[in-house]
Regions:
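Post-HExxH zinc-binding segment in Zn-dependent metallohydrolases
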Residues: 55-65, 226-264
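Short alpha-helical functional segments enriched in proximate histidine and acidic residues
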Residues: 27, 65, 145-148, 210, ...
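Generic beta-strand/beta-sheet core signal
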Residues: 161, 190-192, 210-213, 224
Length: 417
């Protein structure tokens, strides 16, 4: 499947992608930028060169943890498949990690779960179904989290105009998204909600966009956005980190007697790391690869060779079969042909833990960070709103300082977690 997908999706678009690069670069130059990559890197209140160095610095902070996770997962895969499929040294085969792009590894958690700690003790989807909760109930629960922090309820139009379940009468794009239609209060989400754990978390994430959009809607038009694009993705993610057993007890989903004991923590943290930590090098390399294409240091003849090398250097993954030099494996990832900047997702992974740790400190949380929930803490909500309502009106370090007390991005909170 891996080979078929990359051969049939990536390779046929290569010629068109080369044309698109030329057209996009021409437009960037007309706007005063050296190329599209420089234009993308200019949106962070620092020079493109400084931003490139900043992201590399952050990667340096988390790389040792990633390498430890990579080594552990590789050993487990070697135990499962043997040396001929997955050796116990070197790179991991990209098709063994449970995701077409090897960007998140959570789906193979059962394969690598530590003995005795693998069962997390509950499944949110099962808890929802046991109580007969509907997709609307799930969105109401998400709204309830933000309301508990002191944010105003969602407007009536949200419930009338959002697409919360897949319509029966037409085809739709089910990829979850959040919308601000009028820069005032016409906020909506669009998703094909299923009653399961993933969509419960996704709802908390998407509503984060909506509450951010609403918070800065008094700003002048040019400031109607997040402090940087990583902030917008991080807001909902950090709220979702607070979907802890304690929170599930607070909203009546989980029986207090069934809260997992501390001996389940290793499993819980590994499951989080399989998505949160495993994603980091991928989140970085998608744009680093394209910056090279846009500035000409990666030529069309070398597209595939450069992609394979960068995946090896950053992720430590390798294709399951030899790849042709005239292919375009990177094109098999939606954001590449879609020309969507991707570093925002790397930044969001870092920032969400900074926001989460700051909120937990403000709430006076004393236990392990990963068990914290600040549900119901109006002080946290007021401090959060101060950052959100700034929109883009201040440089992002000022917005970051307003909530966390520091103007610098740091991966330390993720490591603490």
């Amino acid at each position: 499947m891996w080979t078929t997908w990359h051969d049939n999706v990536g390779k046929p678009m290569k010629a068109d992608y080369v044309k698109m690069v030329g057209i996009a670069n021409q437009g960037a130059k007309e706007l005063g930028y050296a190329d599209v990559g420089a234009m993308w890197r200019s949106g962070y209140d620092m020079t493109p060169e400084q931003f490139s160095a900043e992201t590399e610095r952050l990667w340096g902070e988390v790389k040792p943890l990633y390498l430890a996770l990579h080594t552990y997962v590789r050993r487990k895969l070697n135990e499962k498949y043997g040396d001929t499929v997955q050796p116990n040294t070197g790179a991991i085969r990209a098709d063994l990690l449970g995701n077409m792009w090897a960007q998140e590894w959570g789906t193979i958690y059962p394969l690598v779960a530590p003995k005795g700690a693998g069962d997390l003790g509950y499944d949110i989807g099962d808890l929802l179904k046991a109580q007969g909760r509907t997709p609307i109930d799930m969105v109401k629960a998400g709204e309830g989290f933000y309301s508990s922090l002191g944010f105003a309820p969602l407007p009536e139009t949200f419930w009338k105009r959002s697409m919360i379940v897949k319509p029966a009468d037409r085809e739709v794009i089910c990829h979850a998204s959040a919308w601000d239609v009028d820069n005032k209060d016409d906020i909506r989400i669009k998703m094909c909600t299923k009653v399961d754990s993933n969509d419960f978390v996704t709802i908390h994430h998407e509503l984060g966009h909506n509450y951010y959009q609403r918070a800065y809607n008094q700003q002048p038009f040019l400031y109607l956005n997040g402090a940087n694009d990583g902030f917008h993705e991080a807001i909902g993610d950090f709220i979702a980190l607070s979907i802890t057993p304690q929170y599930l007890v607070q909203i009546g989903l989980l029986d207090k007697a069934k809260v997992p004991s501390a001996d389940k923590d290793i499993g819980l943290l590994l499951r989080q790391a399989m998505d949160k930590v495993a994603f980091l090098p991928f989140g970085l390399l998608i744009d680093r690869y394209r910056w090279g294409i846009f500035d000409g240091s990666i030529q069309p003849a070398d597209y595939n060779k450069a992609w394979t090398k960068m995946r090896l250097d950053y992720q430590g993954v390798t294709p399951p079969a030899p790849r042709s030099d005239d292919g375009f494996d990177a094109g098999a990832k939606f954001h590449v042909p879609g020309n969507t900047p991707y570093t925002r997702y790397f930044l969001a992974r870092i920032l969400q833990f900074q926001f989460y740790q700051a909120a937990c400190k403000q709430a006076g949380w004393k236990g392990p960070l990963h068990r914290c929930s600040f549900y119901g803490d109006k002080k946290v909500g007021a401090n959060l709103n101060k950052m959100l309502e700034m929109g883009m009106s201040k440089p992002w370090p000022e917005a970051l300082k307003a909530f966390t007390g520091t103007p610098q991005m740091s991966a330390k909170p993720m490591l603490d977690y």
